[in-house]
Design a protein with these regions (language model features):
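N-terminal secretory signal peptides that target proteins for export/translocation
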Residues: 1-21
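Intrinsic disorder/low-complexity segments
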Residues: 6-8, 15, 33, 40, ...
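Sequence-structural signature of mature extracellular/luminal beta-sheet repeat domains
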Residues: 38-369
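Extended rod-forming repeat segments used as scaffolds/tethers
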Residues: 13-15, 21, 25, 234, ...
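Bacterial N-terminal signal peptides
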Residues: 23-37
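Short, intrinsically disordered low-complexity segments
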Residues: 4-6, 22, 36, 76, ...
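Sequence-pattern detector for short linear motifs
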Residues: 8-10, 26, 141, 357
Length: 369
């Protein structure tokens, strides 16, 4: 069952801490998630009796890595990526909520990380560096074939597209940091971009050090971006070793044209800990953050002002009551649709999990129809 704690019992943890990690999920089918709900006696986000259900764990003996970016297709199936390190190009997998079966969509994803869907039912992936495609790919679900949508900004190769979201007009916002890979960098900045319907890539903001997770508010007026600067990757081999930097979540106001307009707001500052990875929103406008923390791994739910509504622990505790290092770290999160609309899908370590929520997600590729 879920354990609820009031504000007094979690004081001192309101400045959320985080970190990133991976592990092979144990063979148990359920974990207990501890939830701290900080706005009242009744939790409005999760059911007290909900359990975290393990749906899939990697079977192949691949080189480390993690699962990432669950994304819901128009038919309700959940696609997600499996990103091994090293020479393996990674996979895109598909979970069917009706049959509970997981199948391979492609065994050569080009180091795909983030996924999303467009209104026509096609899927778009962010292909990263370290031997990957460093581009956005549009996938045909029927044929399994992909075509490049974008791999350059102003003639220069992208760094390593990481995560993305689509707006109601079908335009794709994406983050382009560089965390690893020996490929030479051609762009000075690690920025947030938007792919227009005509194929042009425009820069939305570079007021982030290492942009990672990204999502739009349901009213399309705010762009949320996670800044996860772990020190990263040198621009040039002769540059000094990069230092760790910002671990924050920002809210960028957007104008009617969907461009950053006005000063950003800091919603969460993770301090010296690592920041969040992927994120999603519900139809109320609340933001769900996958916090990659050794100190407090889990899902942080905040409202648009940054106020904490709930926190879900995804990391297992040891006999001392502490979190085990580099275990149970979430990477991304997504809601289902239809009969599955209150299911929250979470990639943790090398697995896919699900938990029941009281809320429903907001999906632009469906709302745009």
């Amino acid at each position: 069952m879920l354990v609820f704690r009031n504000r007094e019992t979690v004081n001192g943890l309101e400045t959320i801490m985080n970190a990133c990690a991976w592990r092979m999920v144990a063979t148990i089918a359920f974990w207990t998630w501890n939830i701290s709900h900080l706005v009242g006696a009744e939790n409005t986000i999760f059911h007290p009796a909900s359990k975290l259900e393990l749906l899939h764990t990697r079977a192949a003996q691949l080189n480390s890595g993690l699962t990432e970016s669950p994304a819901v297709a128009p038919d309700g199936r959940i696609y997600f990526t499996d990103m091994p390190f090293g020479k393996d190009n990674g996979m895109i997998l598909c979970f069917d909520p009706k049959t509970r079966q997981v199948s391979d969509f492609t065994k050569d994803s080009g180091k795909s990380n983030g996924l999303t869907f467009l209104a026509d039912g096609s899927m778009v992936s962010c292909d990263g560096a370290d031997g990957g495609g460093r581009r956005l790919i549009r996938w045909d679900l029927k044929t399994g074939k992909g075509v490049t949508l974008a791999d350059r900004f102003e003639g220069h190769r992208l760094n390593s597209p990481n995560d993305l979201c689509v707006d109601l007009k079908g335009r794709i916002y994406f983050t382009d940091p560089r965390y690893g890979g020996a490929e030479p960098r051609e762009l000075e900045r690690e920025a947030v971009y938007r792919l227009e319907r005509d194929g042009k890539v425009i820069e939305i903001t570079y007021e982030v050090e290492k942009p990672n997770g990204i999502v739009l508010s349901p009213d399309q007026r705010t762009l949320y971006v996670g800044d996860h600067n772990n020190g990263g990757n040198r621009l040039r081999p002769t540059d000094p070793e990069p230092k760790r930097g910002a671990m924050k979540v920002y809210a960028f106001p957007l104008d009617a044209a969907g461009r950053a307009n006005g000063s950003r707001r800091t919603l969460v500052d993770f301090g010296r800990e690592n920041g969040c990875d992927g994120m999603t929103v519900d139809d109320r406008g609340n933001i769900y953050l996958a916090c990659r923390s050794l100190a407090r791994p889990g899902l942080l739910v905040i409202d648009p002002t940054g106020r904490e509504l709930a926190f879900v622990e995804t990391g297992p505790r040891n006999q001392s009551g502490l979190f085990d290092d580099w275990k149970g770290i979430p990477s991304n999160v997504e809601f289902g649709i239809g009969d599955d609309a209150q299911s929250l899908y979470v990639t943790v370590d090398k697995g896919l999990h699900r938990i029941r929520a009281k809320t429903r997600g907001f999906h632009p590729h469906l709302a745009a129809k």
